[in-house]
């Protein structure tokens, strides 16, 4: 399967109309599609358009409640706990980070922990909400268990990504990564492409290394054992315990502080997923002059970029640069979407009684795709 490129405006219009069909109001729709398309613009395909079908299935199963509103259930001047009541993760998370930012602007710091939510997209989106207002932003989330702990053979933690963002010149700093070697979404992309997984990513039900994407994904869904390795692989000598530990830090900020559902139990209920998030915003001004701190940080980032390069390498990047470059290129030349994802979107349109061809003119569906059903 190959890729086809679409303009940002084409995908924006499509996402807008789909989420309105799902029952979200205009403001909610704007938030959801902005999170999704930001992922695609940044080159994080696993968390972009290809997630739409999973969201629809969540709504159909009743694990995502489109009409739910986030509620503050505990609060201090510097912290809050929010119950998402099983609503859309992007809407809940946007609300939560706004709360953290509000507190940071008043007191210097804001910490918010969320329970009873759903998949929220890319963590970096919410960290950037704070950095764009001159604050340091942090976002993390637990998820359905996919990480096999060091020395284990059963998934017990989610991919548990952590993102940190801070303003700098000429490029802002944005670090966003899972605490597993890769995310579940990356496995889904390999499954769609039909390619074997790279070695060092996943384990089968017996705890042995596997390159079989369909089998690993089926085991994750069926809770049969196996899953994805922590950062550092599956051996302590290679640093597996470090990724495992970072995953636990995320779990503390999300499910533990909120008294929510831990990763091993997420997505095991019939009527909810119970996913939890953590957010923080910190005003650099609590440490001194904010502009001086920004300049100092910017200088160090430039020092990193100008440091000696390995032989044959032309450039050293700081975190967030590649996303900026990807966004520029994709806004100019189009966003690539996998053919199998296009088939899923066509099936979704049939189900929602939307005209797929009205959005994607002249696109011919590959009917031989294993993802083609004709009606979803």
Label each region the model flagged:
Residues 73-83, 94-110, 211-231:
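Residues forming anionic-ligand binding surfaces in small-molecule and nucleic-acid pockets
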Residues 1-8, 13-32, 37-38, 45-66, ...:
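Acidic, glycine/proline-rich low-complexity segments that act as flexible tails and inter-domain linkers
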Residues 196-266:
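Secondary-shell segments that build the walls of catalytic and ion/ligand-binding clefts
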Residues 47-101:
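Active-site cofactor/substrate anionic-group-binding motifs, chiefly glycine-
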Residues 2-14, 252, 257, 262-376:
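Catalytic-core signal marking the mid-to-C-terminal active-site face
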Residues 147-221:
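Phosphate/diphosphate-binding glycine-rich loops and adjacent basic-rich segments that engage nucleotide
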């Amino acid at each position: 399967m190959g890729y086809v490129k679409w303009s940002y405006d084409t995908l924006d219009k499509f996402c807008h109309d789909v989420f309105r069909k799902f029952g979200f109001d205009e403001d909610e729709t704007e938030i959801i599609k902005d999170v999704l398309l930001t992922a695609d613009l940044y080159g994080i395909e696993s968390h972009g358009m290809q997630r739409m079908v999973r969201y629809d299935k969540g709504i159909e199963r009743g694990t995502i409640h489109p009409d739910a509103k986030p509620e503050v259930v505990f609060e201090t001047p510097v912290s809050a706990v929010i119950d998402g009541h099983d609503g859309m993760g992007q809407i809940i998370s946007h609300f939560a980070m706004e709360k953290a930012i509000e507190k940071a602007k008043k007191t210097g710091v804001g910490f918010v922990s969320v329970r009873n939510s759903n998949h929220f997209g890319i963590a970096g989106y919410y960290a950037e909400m704070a950095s764009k207002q001159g604050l340091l932003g942090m976002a993390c989330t637990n998820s359905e268990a996919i990480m096999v702990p060091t020395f284990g053979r059963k998934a017990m933690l989610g991919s548990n990504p952590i993102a940190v963002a801070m303003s700098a010149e000429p490029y802002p700093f944005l670090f966003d990564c899972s605490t597993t070697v890769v995310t579940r979404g990356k496995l889904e992309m390999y499954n769609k492409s039909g390619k074997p997984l790279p070695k060092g990513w996943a384990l089968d039900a017996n705890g042995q290394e596997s390159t079989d994407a369909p089998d690993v994904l089926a085991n994750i869904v069926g809770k049969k054992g196996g899953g994805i390795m922590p950062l550092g692989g599956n051996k302590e000598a290679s640093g597996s315990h470090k990724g495992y530990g970072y995953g636990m830090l995320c779990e503390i900020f999300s499910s533990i502080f909120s008294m929510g559902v831990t990763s091993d139990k997420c997505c095991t209920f019939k009527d909810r997923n119970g996913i939890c998030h953590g957010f923080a915003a910190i005003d650099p001004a609590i440490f001194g002059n904010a502009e001086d701190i920004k300049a100092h940080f910017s200088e160090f980032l430039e020092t990193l970029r100008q440091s000696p390069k390995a032989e044959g390498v032309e450039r050293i990047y700081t975190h967030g640069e590649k996303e900026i470059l990807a966004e520029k290129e994709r806004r100019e030349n189009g966003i690539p979407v996998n053919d199998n994802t296009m088939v899923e979107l066509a099936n979704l349109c049939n189900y929602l009684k939307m005209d797929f061809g009205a959005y994607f003119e002249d696109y011919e569906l590959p009917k031989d795709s294993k993802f083609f059903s004709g009606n979803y």
